Amino acid sequence: MANSRILNDTAIDGQIEETTAWKDFLSLIKIGIVNSNLITTFTGMWLALHISGLSFLGNINTVLLTLIGSSLIIAGSCAINNWYDRDIDHLMERTKVRPTVTGKIQPSQALWSGILLVALGLIMLLMTTVMAAVIGFIGVFTYVVLYTMWTKRRYTINTVVGSVSGAVPPLIGWTAVEGNIGVVAWVLFMILFIWQIPHFLALAIKKTEDYRAANIPMLPVVYGFEVTKRQIIVWVACLMPLPFFLGSLGLPIVILGLLLNIGWLILGLMGFRSKNIMKWATQMFVYSLNYMTIYFVAMVVLTLF
């Protein structure tokens, strides 16, 4: 009986360790970022199939290769980012529990896991089209080298540079089907590129003290909240004309885009009268998340019929 109990306890401990290790891995690859980028990748691919008149089920191999491949390169890039930033992540409340900081994942494990994931992802994208793999590589290079290693710790423009890499998933999805980049694909890229800047600036306001502690030159740290609020308004306003370039997808998508943009702009302007900037920044951040999810999912749903 005693031996049986010991064996059961040992088995439970092993299961807990496996669960913890899996959670640490998901934290390393920033699974939330991977999942959100799956939405935009799928939308780009779906619209390419829709406009080209191609069957979704008839191209299921391309769909799976693209979704898995893009997920792998994003996961790998995030792992490399965690490896590189481990020396500053312990200074910020938001990142101090990352497994590369706590020691649950060794630096070499994080680095080589990231490299392996990126390599596998690029191979899978190459099995769709060369262009998809090239764009995937550009996204990885921009995020890992231009953003993480170069601009993040040096320039306030880091947010703009990082937004380039975050905008390539729909291009990957599109080119995996088409092999070239159409007008709609470029509009999706521009929407995501511009969207990310007010999204991350709102987050930067919320986490200003974290970034200041880590000596990361985010806009609100260097120039203050008022300048950051004006920049947010400018970038949200830049989204206004983009839905008009999606007319080929139908009037409902154009109208939805305009309504989302107007709502975001109004909320942004309210920041100049808000007495609680942290509450306003949180509202802007949450709105941005809903904006991206609603608009990109709607593009798929509204083109089903």
From Swiss-Prot:
Keywords: Cell membrane, Heme biosynthesis, Membrane, Transferase, Transmembrane, Transmembrane helix. Pathway: Porphyrin-containing compound metabolism; heme O biosynthesis; heme O from protoheme: step 1/1. Its EC number is 2.5.1.141. It is an enzyme of class 2 (transferase). The chain crosses the membrane at residues 38-58, 60-80, 115-135, 157-177, 181-201, 227-247, 249-269, 285-305. CDD domains: PT_UbiA_Cox10 (cd13957). It holds the Pfam family UbiA. One of its GO terms (molecular function) is protoheme IX farnesyltransferase activity. Its main location: membrane. Interacts with CtaA. Belongs to the UbiA prenyltransferase family. Protoheme IX farnesyltransferase subfamily. This is Protoheme IX farnesyltransferase 2. It comes from Bacillus subtilis (strain 168).
